[in-house]
Amino acid sequence: MAGIGKKKKKKFDYYDAFEAQAALCVKEAKLLKEIVHDFESAAELEKELPRAHAIEREADGVCHSVFEALLPDFVTPLDREDIIAMTESLDEIIDMTEEVIQNFYMFDVHFMHEDAKKFSKLIVRACEALSEAMVDFRNCKKASEKLNSLLVRVNDIEDEADALFLNIIRELYVEECDNPMRVSVWTRLFEAMEDCVDQCEAVANKMSMIMVKY
C-alpha cells in the first residue's frame, strides 16, 4: 500500500520554542552584564556588537520557525493569537537588550555608571526567572506553585527596577545638573534598561493570563 513505512513528520513543539527564546534572553542579558562590568571604552565595546547581533539573529530564527509551523498547523496547544503574542513578546526582550548594548556604543559613553551594573544584574535576574518559569509553562493548564512563584519573582524584580530607576534619575538631575548632555544620555540609557525589565514583566503577565484562560 502507498504510504506504508513512510515516517510521520514530527509535530512542532511550541513550548520548546518558548524555552529556546527564553534561554536566548538570558544569553543576551548575560552578555550585556559582561559588557557593562568589563567596560573600557565605546571603541572596545564595538567588538562585542557582532556577538549581541548573533544572539538576536538566532532568536529571529526561532520566531520564523514558530510562524512557519503555525501556517499549516490546525491543532495547536494554545490559541494561535497566544502563541504569536508569546513569541513576539519574548523576541522583544532580546531586541531591547541588544539595543541597550548598541546604545552604549552609539552614545560613545566614556565611563560606565555604577548603577548600570546594578541594572544589568536585574535584567539577568528577570530573564533567568522567566527562563526557569518557561520550563514549567508547558504544563500551564495545571499551573504549579513553582511556576506561579517564578512569575511573581519577575514582577518583584520589576518593582526593584522601578525603584532603582527612580533614584538613579533623581541623582542624575541633582548631581549632574551642570552637564545636561550627560543627564540626557544616561537618562536614555537607563530608560532602555528599565524597558528590558518591563518587557520581562509583560511576558510574565501574558503567561499568567494564559494560565487563567486555560
PLM region spans:
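Cytosolic, long alpha-helical scaffolding segments
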Residues: 1-214
